[in-house]
Amino acid sequence: MPTEQLENGFSFHGLGTQISFPRGTVATVDGDGRDVVLVWLFDYRGGYALLVIDAETGETEEFPVPFPPGDDCPYASILSSMNRFYTLFNGYFVEFDVLRREYSFFHETAPRMAMGMTEDDDGLIWSSTYPQSGVVCYNPKNGDFTDYGHVYEQNWRQYPTTLAADDTGWLYFGIGTTLSQIIAFDKECGTGIPLLAEEERVKGSPSVFRDMNGKVYAIPPDDTAWAAENPGDEGWFELYKGERKTVAKHELKEKLFIAGKAFHFHPDFPNGKKLERCDLADRELEVSDPRSGDTHKVSFDYSSEGAHIMGVARAPGDTICGGTFFPRRFFSYNPKDDSWIRRESYAQWNTVVTQGDLFFVGGYGSGFLLEWDPTRDWVPTDKDNPESNPFWHRICTPILHRPHDLLAHPDGKTILMAGTPGYGSTGGGLLIWDRESSTGELLEHTDLLPDHSTMSLVALSGGKLLGGTTTEAGTGGEKKAEVAELYQMDLSTKVIDWREALLQGGQSYTDLCVGESGLVYGFVDRARFFVFDPNEKRVIQEMDSEKAYGLTAFQQGPRVFVVAPRGEIYILFERGIGLLDEGSFEIDLVAESPVEISNGGDVLEGRLYFTSTSGLYSWELP
């Protein structure tokens, strides 16, 4: 699709990718006895539809969800014994009747999405929900629906990712990730009972499994934040009638359900055939028949409005490059001939920046650092392949798991990556990477500001570094710091020589930018603009920018400030583009955007490039 010219000097160049992501895939049979594949579809809007694919012909039918997706999506789903497909997200429980090919029930619930789903011995459908251990029950035989609300609250967001019911009707789920807990739920009185004493709780998530003997077994957390999958010999519990009993390692004979978490893939058709592949990128489906040994491949199609773009930057060779998430794809746009290159990327490119003739990527998960040379052939990233391009340097998890800023230092050799820590943790680290030696030093939050994570960075004169923090913990972690701070580090010694919470009540320094005079401009919580004098260590001006211009643009790696080649500082707000007057510190909204701006941002050949949800746009500079 060629670039579309919009009003007021804006242009729409296309989508980063026109592929959706599967959030639960199951093989089953419809009411006519035909093999079908069900896929929950996810693009920038959220979980927008259920796709039903005829496994023989590739014919498809889409069923838009009967409620607003709200930028949320399925994190758990289950195909019941009655051949009905369930999920719960954005505060809505929904049932799809496969035999009749229609949504047969939906109901609003307490926030927000199911992390675990199961079916009990009476055929009741249960879900355990994020963020505060919500419990929902649905009876498909008579349509009775009960939302028990949040039954176990903490001051951090809980992930109740495994769920099981014993043969007496008691429900159990394990939660994490900040501290483990097992909840027994009594449906008769609608209460959740914690089974672990406070002193027994550790970081991570226990797992629960239903056994064929009618009881539920729980295993303790392993060395990850997520539900344990590789149990040891110690710490097992037998759960029955709401009580726990310590037992030796149990040889599980698990009662199986067609249920799973976000990326659940159930390949078995009732007639014995097997779904080998359902590829939304290539739009191909492959089914094998173990009896005949034959494999059948068909093409299919579906609608998609594309995945969220994380952020974009000018790459060497004068292209605009970036990445999308779910699906995780790389793209490169060349304005010279209005052409695109799109490829599968190595995980999620949260932050991107150019230094010299190389393009760097800071990514989620695991806090990885990549280096891409656009002059060489693309070789898919493999950390064990030294010929990879992009080249994999290292990971930083759990100290730094989700990058929020990637700074190309003006010394031409140093790359700094900062962000939040792994799941269930508080306080993120900082990677200082030396390109010349291909070595880096990873500082922990205790080396910086304990219980803070660095959200934004700029280089100051004299070998100093200025950082702005966020009080947000890692996903599912406990927030401990009360207010965000600015800090100054000596880059040679890696020592913090100044820190202060200058802006009262601020929770996150969204982005920072150094002006020609050496003053630093920034935003707090996307809503407050300030000017900071790094010599005097004080804020010399502050304004409520939200009131005047609305919130700034935002993504996991914010690029709110865009500096043009002649030094002009542009600011990306959701509603338009601002120009900063460095003399008066006033902001002039020079262009109202025809679309809501999501993130930046870079300048190339006289145009300022930015993103809006899944699309790449630009505006002609004056």
Task: Mark where each language-model region is.
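Blade-level signature of beta-propeller repeat domains, shared across WD40, Kelch, NHL, RCC1
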Residues: 595-622
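Residue-level signature of beta-propeller blades and closely related beta-rich strand-turn architectures
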Residues: 43, 91, 131, 177, ...
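Conserved beta-propeller blade signature
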Residues: 36-40, 84-87, 124-127, 171-174, ...
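Surface loop/turn motifs at the tips and blade-to-blade linkers of beta-strand repeat domains
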Residues: 13-21, 64-69, 106-110, 149-155, ...
